[in-house]
């Protein structure tokens, strides 16, 4: 007996880095595409990039989420849901099918510096989750998707160990605030 497969791949579009969602022309295109294709999730990454002006060294928990809120406010107001990658992906350039992908050197520096300390990362993520629950409500945030990117270019035991340590911390922190 065959069953109809649920079309889960047709309800999400990739936007690129989160800061693109601050641009009005990108927002207009998303609204137009939503009307045409009726998707539910917007997938983006680099929510901790410098464009959001969040001081990652602020350990008193008073992070400035104002610019990040603009992204979430837009999505929620349009009836869309975030699908956030909590990792920091470099912009990659693919010249042709045979070439190697290259990342932007400017981004490479903040990719490696921002969350070298797991406690610092946990403190920030804890504050972010508290903020999201307070601003948007647990019921809403429970419907959001979150993932954590692994850089495929780092195939080593140390890279895997660090990734899974970070992933475990992210999973525990997110689950503390959200059942989704």
Each predicted region: which residue ranges?
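Substrate-binding cleft and catalytic face of glycoside hydrolase catalytic domains
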Residues: 37-180
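Mature N-terminal, pre-catalytic/accessory segment of carbohydrate-active enzymes
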Residues: 1-40, 44-47, 58
């Amino acid at each position: 007996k065959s069953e109809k497969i649920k079309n889960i791949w047709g309800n999400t579009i990739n936007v690129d880095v989160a800061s693109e969602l601050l641009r009005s022309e990108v927002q207009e295109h998303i609204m137009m595409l939503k009307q045409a294709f009726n998707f539910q999730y917007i997938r983006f990454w680099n929510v901790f990039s410098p464009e959001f002006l969040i001081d990652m060294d602020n350990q008193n928990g008073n992070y400035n989420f104002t610019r990040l809120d603009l992204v979430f406010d837009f999505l929620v107001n349009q009836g869309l849901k975030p699908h956030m990658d909590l990792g920091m992906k470099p912009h990659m350039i693919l010249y042709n099918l045979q070439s190697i992908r290259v990342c932007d050197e400017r981004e490479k520096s903040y990719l490696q510096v921002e969350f070298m300390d797991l406690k610092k990362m946990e403190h920030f993520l804890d504050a972010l989750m508290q903020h999201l629950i307070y601003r948007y409500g647990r019921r809403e945030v429970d419907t959001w998707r979150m993932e954590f990117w692994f850089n495929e270019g780092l195939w080593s035991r140390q890279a895997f160990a660090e990734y899974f340590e970070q992933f475990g911390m992210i999973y525990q922190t997110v689950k503390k605030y959200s059942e989704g």
